[in-house]
Amino acid sequence: MYAVVRTGSKQYRVRVGDVIEVEKLPVEPGQAVTLEEVLLVERDGTVTVGQPVVPGARVVARVLDQVKGPKLIVFKMKPKTRYRRKTGHRQRYTRLQVEAIEVGAAS
């Protein structure tokens, strides 16, 4: 059984037990998170596609950690003027472990 969920303007294909990194969510490590935007669910060979979401479906996950991604260097330069700017950016992510995929009343 797997599901496709949308969070932080990105889509993730998840199974129970998977660990995924999503855009930062305002939660503490150890808390449970419910992802309501389930776009697709596959169960026992039957695929249910939402229009746009599957009604009654949700993914329950546990927050493992708040982490930062790799540093990206942003370098601006204008020729012949000695203009140079170098900055870095590290995106923040929330690491989740999928605990359950629930569809309708039965899960």
UniProtKB/Swiss-Prot annotation:
Sequence intervals crossing the membrane: none
CC per GO annotation: cytoplasm; ribonucleoprotein complex; ribosome
Any one Gene Ontology BP term: translation
GO molecular function: rRNA binding; structural constituent of ribosome
Record's keyword terms, sorted: Ribonucleoprotein, Ribosomal protein, RNA-binding, rRNA-binding
Keyword rRNA-binding: yes
Domain of life: Bacteria
InterPro entries xref list: bL21-like, bL21-like_sf, Ribosomal_bL21, Ribosomal_bL21_CS
UniProt xrefs under PROSITE patterns: RIBOSOMAL_L21
Function per UniProt: This protein binds to 23S rRNA in the presence of protein L20.
Family statement drawn from the similarity comment of this UniProt entry: Belongs to the bacterial ribosomal protein bL21 family.
Subunit structure: Part of the 50S ribosomal subunit. Contacts protein L20.
Protein name (record): Large ribosomal subunit protein bL21
Organism from which the protein derives: Thermomicrobium roseum (strain ATCC 27502 / DSM 5159 / P-2)
